[in-house]
Amino acid sequence: MTFTIMTDSTADLNQTWAEDHDIVLIGLTILCDGEVYETVGPNRISSDYLLKKMKAGSHPQTSQINVGEFEKVFREHARNNKALLYLAFSSVLSGTYQSALMARDLVREDYPDAVIEIVDTLAAAGGEGYLTILAAEARDSGKNLLETKDIVEAVIPRLRTYFLVDDLFHLMRGGRLSKGSAFLGSLASIKPLLWIDEEGKLVPIAKIRGRQKAIKEMVAQVEKDIADSTVIVSYTSDQGSAEKLREELLAHENISDVLMMPLGPVISAHVGPNTLAVFVIGQNSR
């Protein structure tokens, strides 16, 4: 039985790639300066446009996917007797996962045998994208839905996500980081390195003076535990630093490929300009 893989716009996957690999994308929305912007489809807002507005003083807000949007997609699949695997944006960072659970319950009232599996990835951006790529590879190699789900869920505890943010104000403003942590990042070029812990929370793990030293520390953190030879590097604005980070990672003997994946508008709204991120699968749980 074939099945659909779906994920959010927060996975930051290239939309052409997603279409080519039969991945359904469902989008969060962004409110900025009184306008509502889509993050999926031909009229989606670009990260560059949003970041320019943020540099000019705009404070965008993001909205989770509502129950009705999920219900529409789930009901269509149930009506056509097609199974669906949805890889959800972290439940710690958004209410989107809960909306999906509620929508599934509604659909199963009419279609009790509907096959709708929902995974809380506890991830965002390239991490969520990484898991979706693994799911697509598993499905395309002949794995069924439950086998694919098991593969993804086995990787989630070992997925390591590192963020280097130029200004923690945006994370604090959006409620993704405490005011105390954000204050530390505002002191005299101190650059906190953050990661997503085992509970899915975004927390500081190191405080480094200067951006270049912080990038080297990010590489050092990645080198501590590598299981998969593919690494994803994401960025906002500063592609040059991202390329340098890629080169440093490729110098490691256990890394054979580094995929470059620009951060999408939803994540950009929360981290701001000049952010770098690395996503890697380790041997051990976080």
Curated annotation (Swiss-Prot):
Hexadecanoate binds at T62, S94. Residues 3-282 form the DegV domain. One of its GO terms (molecular function) is lipid binding. The keyword Cell division does not apply. Keywords: Lipid-binding. Disulfide bonds: none annotated. May bind long-chain fatty acids, such as palmitate, and may play a role in lipid transport or fatty acid metabolism. This is DegV domain-containing protein SPy_1936/M5005_Spy1650. The lineage of its organism: Bacteria, Bacillati, Bacillota, Bacilli, Lactobacillales.
